[in-house]
Amino acid sequence: MSFEGKIALVTGASRGIGRAIAETLVARGAKVIGTATSENGAKNISDYLGANGKGLMLNVTDPASIESVLENIRAEFGEVDILVNNAGITRDNLLMRMKDDEWNDIIETNLSSVFRLSKAVMRAMMKKRCGRIITIGSVVGTMGNAGQANYAAAKAGLIGFSKSLAREVASRGITVNVVAPGFIETDMTRALSDDQRAGILAQVPAGRLGGAQEIASAVAFLASDEASYITGETLHVNGGMYMV
């Protein structure tokens, strides 16, 4: 599974799942451009990618910022072959208390950004008759979660968006898929109390949290030639927490 000669764009690549994805694609030969919301985050990405890529600052809710980043990538590396939409935020609240900005921020960052970025790379992929668009969803997008109506709506929306786009571009050799993680070991989960952690693990038949590398491996498979006949799918990586 080699990505030699491929250019990959991974949003939200400064840490966690995004960083694991970027490092996995680099290890398999791709040139990777990772994005962050701050200059310091972009520098950190450049530092860990080294000669194999670059970190850039990107506001995924701003069309001008997206176009600027893509122009930078074209000038230095060429057109994007693999787009990984990983950037996302949470603004949790019960619906009765949820403010409009808590709803709108999540939809703009977690859903509308995927529309903008996918559209921005589409023309070049269609010309090459090859491309991979992989979006990081969530188990919450399928099963729902109290206090996350905004987040669940955005993550569910990604699935419908990806299925529709997959139908539009399949004849051009472009695949569009979603990877939906369950509970993944992160800085946030490591800070949980023993009781909180036990409550989470009780929902997972595998009896453990997932690792960021396990999500990255799923992304790498869907980005590969081996997955060229898989499109419009959601790959659930959740230890059996939710079985579709």
UniProtKB/Swiss-Prot annotation:
Any Pfam family from its record, for instance, is: adh_short_C2
Using the UniProt record, name the top-level EC class of this enzyme in a single word: oxidoreductase
- Tell me which residues bind Ca(2+) 3: E233, T234
Q: Which amino acids does the record list as binding Ca(2+) 2?
A: N145
* Residue numbers binding NADP(+): G12, A13, S14, R15, T37, N59, V60, N86, Y151, A152, A153, A154, K155, I184
What GO molecular functions are on record for this protein?
3-oxoacyl-[acyl-carrier-protein] reductase (NADPH) activity; metal ion binding; NAD binding; NADP binding; oxidoreductase activity, acting on the CH-OH group of donors, NAD or NADP as acceptor
Q: Which sites are catalytic?
A: Y151
**InterPro entries (alphabetical):** 3oxo_ACP_reduc, NAD(P)-bd_dom_sf, Sc_DH/Rdtase_CS, SDR, SDR_fam
Annotated keywords:
Calcium, Fatty acid biosynthesis, Fatty acid metabolism, Lipid biosynthesis, Lipid metabolism, Metal-binding, NADP, Oxidoreductase
List the catalysed reactions: a (3R)-hydroxyacyl-[ACP] + NADP(+) = a 3-oxoacyl-[ACP] + NADPH + H(+)
**Has the keyword ATP-binding been applied to this entry?**
no
Effect annotated for changing M125I: Loss of the temperature-sensitive phenotype
In short, the EC number is: 1.1.1.100
At the top level of its lineage, which domain of life is listed? Bacteria
Q: What is the effect of changing S224F?
A: Distorts the local conformation and prevent stacking around Phe-221. The S224F mutation would additionally disrupt the hydrogen bond formed between Ser-224 and Glu-226
Residues annotated to bind Ca(2+) 1: G50, G53
Where is substrate bound in this sequence?
Answer: S138
Q: In which pathway does it act?
A: Lipid metabolism; fatty acid biosynthesis
Which CDD domains does the entry link to? BKR_SDR_c
Q: Which Gene3D superfamilies match?
A: NAD(P)-binding Rossmann-like Domain
Q: Which residues form a coiled coil?
A: none
Q: What does it do?
A: Catalyzes the NADPH-dependent reduction of beta-ketoacyl-ACP substrates to beta-hydroxyacyl-ACP products, the first reductive step in the elongation cycle of fatty acid biosynthesis.
**What more does the entry say?**
Calcium ions stabilize the structure, and may inhibit FabG activity by obstructing access to the active site.
So what family is this one in?
Answer: Belongs to the short-chain dehydrogenases/reductases (SDR) family.
Binding partners and assembly: Homotetramer.
**Name assigned to this protein:** 3-oxoacyl-[acyl-carrier-protein] reductase FabG
